[in-house]
Amino acid sequence: QIAANANFKYKTAVENYEKINHLYEEIRTSPGALRVIPKPVAKYDELTEVKAKAAEETYEAGIQALLKNTREDAKQAYYYFNDANTFSPGYREAIEMIEQAKFNATLKVVVQPSLINYRDWNFEPIVFGYNANMFVKFYTPQQAEELKLEKVDQYIKVIVNGYQEGRPIITSKTESFSDSVKTGEKIVKGVKTPIHTKVSATLTTYTKKITGRGSINLIITDAGNRAEIKNQDIIADETWSDSWGTYKGDERALSDGAKRLCQKKEPYPERTYIENRTRKELDNRLSNELRSFYSRY
């Protein structure tokens, strides 16, 4: 039964007929179910007929939504046209209307280039790599001009404030070790007995830490009134640390871990290691900020 005035009545009918046909196939392939329901009913002909009407129904809904000329209505139109094309592939101009609705629904953001900055850091790949919301698209100024975009919604810019690396900070701690080690044997009443000697050592453990800090500024501006929508500093700190040791006394008193520590020399990170790690963390934080901000669109 299809209600005369129900919203999307044919779309609902498609869903119901598909459920009936699924149940029909389940029964048809189950001997036990066939004993209970020997003549299951299928609705394939009805489904074909109602799909055509559902395509028309959702296509017209898409047209009406698109005529309202808002981003949110264009989004809805996009889904309506997709439904129409699913019900009847290639229905009228459904494919073209899907593209038009998506274009109308898309927030168009022009990425403004940054000035020459520290080590030519470039965060544009992170911005252009954003894909968490299909209704947000970023353009270079050249692309916006070539495409003759009638309306730009926002401008976005990432400014590199700089990178600083602190002086190495070295801390130390000293601890004592002692042990009893076998140094020989003696015969006591005809029995070999080990001779133990107490040994001791002091271990000094040195830890070197170097911290790098990078900072960028994310600015998003409304293209219509040039008001700043977002102006945020994004900061990343990255710390490198390593340890080595020295000892005084008898090495035999040291644990295996302490011995390995004493075999190391004072460490130094690779020249750009901390900087590269800091840059990678800035990439991650910028990506997260974009994902969070544009999720509302």
Enumerate the predicted regions with their spans.
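Start-of-domain marker
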Residues: 1-6, 116-132, 149
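Short beta-strand->alpha-helix linker/helix-N-cap micro-motif
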Residues: 111, 115, 134-157
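Short, intrinsically disordered/low-complexity patches at protein termini
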Residues: 110, 117-119, 181, 252-254
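Surface-exposed short loop/turn segments
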Residues: 124-125, 133, 149-229, 233-244, ...
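Short linear motifs at secondary-structure transitions and domain/linker junctions
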Residues: 32-35, 84-89, 130-136, 186-196
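C-terminal/domain-edge helix-coil "capping" segments
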Residues: 1-64, 68-104, 204-297
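N-terminal post-signal-peptidase region of extra-cytosolic proteins
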Residues: 96, 137-143, 198-203
